[in-house]
């Protein structure tokens, strides 16, 4: 369904002058080997609320003829879960971008919203003719709004709300993926019933945040990536996932503010990266950006001074991915970099 209403709220994009994929100039020191912790205060008030995000999506839907806005289901607390769709030809390859399975990992959502705006600027002329794009921002809206059935009094962020990893029922949505669909939490259940079961998806990037102290080669990472590591996933699916990772790595690593490591992740089918690849044959990539928007452990949260580069990193990732899929250059990507990409470790917190 297409929804048409006026936007009623502020946009973080306009606040930060992030109108295009170029976003904002970021000093190289902001990421690689960047600040250890205390990188500015953690302010949730500058982030989109659920309500302002919905208004933003409706405004973009009104402006963009290529975009359709669909409600795929509801959260535990009854919030509609939105998906932005760009489908020009059912025969095109399709990519899904998923953000905020964990509610306290929001800057990837801010980047996804900027990318949606970017898709309506004309700077992707021709791209949308050759790839279908599905974007689900803020899957876990209850956790993002702190509207949960447990206490968040130990969380550290300042602002108008706290954000938590878990959904309203205190469940980690990224551990639901091995269950029967009917046994999943509502947010995961609707993702499966109304997206993964409905659309012929070829690629997916699952966007997350991690703590602030992950490093490789003595430098703090700006993000880490990983393909499906469950042994039951088809080898061709894994190889295509590695090619997807190659697109992301070769886009970000050469930039002065980018430093990418290999994520040290599990192989369980209950994790989205593995379970979705195993169940549907979708080539998936996990991207863990540096720092969270809120947490009860201080070293996990990254302050607002780092917001710009994390948003830019997300937009660059999504833009490069759709272009590589659209022109089929992803099929020629060299995956050998994975053989030498260091697996991240955690730097000791000196504070």
Question: Where are the predicted features?
Answer:
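Sec-dependent N-terminal signal peptides of Gram-positive bacterial secreted proteins and lipoproteins
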Residues: 1-29
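C-terminal accessory segments enriched in acidic
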Residues: 3-6, 26-49, 187-188, 196-207, ...
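Soluble metallo-hydrolase cores and metallopeptidase-like ectodomains found primarily
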Residues: 45-93
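Loop/turn elements at helix/coil->beta-strand transitions in domains of secreted/extracellular proteins
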Residues: 65-68, 77-79, 91-94, 129-134, ...
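Active-site-proximal beta-strand/loop segments in catalytic clefts of secreted hydrolases
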Residues: 72-74, 86, 98-101, 136-140, ...
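Alpha-helical scaffolding within the catalytic cores
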Residues: 81, 150-160, 268-274
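Mid-chain, structured segments of secreted extracytoplasmic proteins
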Residues: 81-88, 93-101, 105-113
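Active-site/substrate-binding loop(s) of hydrolase catalytic cores
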Residues: 92, 106-110, 115-235
């Amino acid at each position: 369904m297409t929804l048409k209403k006026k936007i009623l709220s502020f946009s973080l994009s306009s606040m930060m002058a992030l109108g295009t994929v170029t976003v904002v100039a970021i000093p190289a020191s902001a990421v690689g080997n960047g600040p250890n912790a205390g990188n500015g205060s953690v302010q949730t008030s500058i982030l989109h609320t659920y309500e302002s995000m919905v208004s933003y999506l409706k405004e973009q839907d009104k402006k963009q003829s290529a975009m359709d806005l669909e409600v795929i289901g509801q959260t535990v607390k009854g919030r509609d879960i939105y998906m932005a769709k760009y489908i020009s030809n059912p025969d095109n390859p399709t990519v899904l971008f998923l953000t905020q399975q964990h509610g306290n990992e929001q800057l990837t959502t801010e980047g996804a919203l900027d990318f949606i705006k970017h898709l309506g600027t004309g700077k992707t002329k021709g791209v949308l003719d050759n790839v279908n794009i599905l974007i689900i921002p803020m899957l876990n809206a209850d956790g993002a709004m702190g509207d949960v059935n447990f206490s968040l009094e130990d969380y550290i962020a300042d602002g108008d709300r706290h954000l938590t990893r878990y959904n309203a029922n205190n469940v980690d949505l990224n551990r639901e993926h091995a269950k029967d669909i009917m046994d999943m939490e509502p947010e995961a259940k609707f993702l499966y019933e109304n997206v993964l079961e409905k659309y012929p998806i070829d690629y997916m990037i699952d966007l997350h945040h991690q703590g602030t102290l992950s490093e490789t080669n003595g430098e703090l990472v700006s993000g880490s990536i990983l393909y499906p590591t469950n042994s039951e996933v088809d080898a061709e699916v894994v190889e295509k996932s590695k090619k997807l990772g190659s697109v992301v790595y070769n886009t970000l690593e050469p930039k002065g503010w980018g430093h990418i490591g290999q994520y040290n992740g599990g192989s369980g089918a209950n994790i989205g990266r593995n379970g979705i690849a195993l169940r549907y044959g979708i080539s998936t990539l996990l991207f863990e950006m540096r720092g969270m928007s809120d947490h009860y452990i201080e070293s996990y949260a990254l302050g607002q001074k780092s917001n710009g580069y994390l948003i830019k990193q997300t937009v660059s990732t999504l833009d490069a991915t759709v272009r590589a899929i659209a022109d089929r250059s992803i099929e020629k990507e060299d995956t050998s970099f994975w053989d030498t990409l260091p697996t991240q470790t955690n730097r000791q917190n000196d504070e």
